[in-house]
């Protein structure tokens, strides 16, 4: 299993959130999730300006095996999307925690971040899933 970055927060549905410090949160899917999905062939991005709700679908990733919703970890407004994923969805497979980010949300309520899983808790969830 790949290393889980210590600066991220997670949802049980395998999305990650990186708090940028300027009231913005970058969102992607975990390396575990991309591994389960296999080779990604398409990413449906939200539109800049869309309002997203914590726990609701905001994007879709499709592999040769399945399509999966990407849930927003926080409520807010989409301020940026990773448009390069339209041409290269496999970037998520190659670098899930870096270049494979999906969208950025300007967060409405920073308290929501406290409800997300810390890296250690996420690692524990993955271990439990494996048994």
UniProtKB/Swiss-Prot annotation:
Keyword Transit peptide: no
CDD domains in alphabetical order: GCS_H
Role noted for this protein: The glycine cleavage system catalyzes the degradation of glycine. The H protein shuttles the methylamine group of glycine from the P protein to the T protein.
Assembly mode: The glycine cleavage system is composed of four proteins: P, T, L and H.
HAMAP family (alphabetical): GcvH (MF_00272)
PANTHER family membership: GLYCINE CLEAVAGE SYSTEM H PROTEIN (PTHR11715), GLYCINE CLEAVAGE SYSTEM H PROTEIN-RELATED (PTHR11715:SF3)
Protein name stated in the entry: Glycine cleavage system H protein
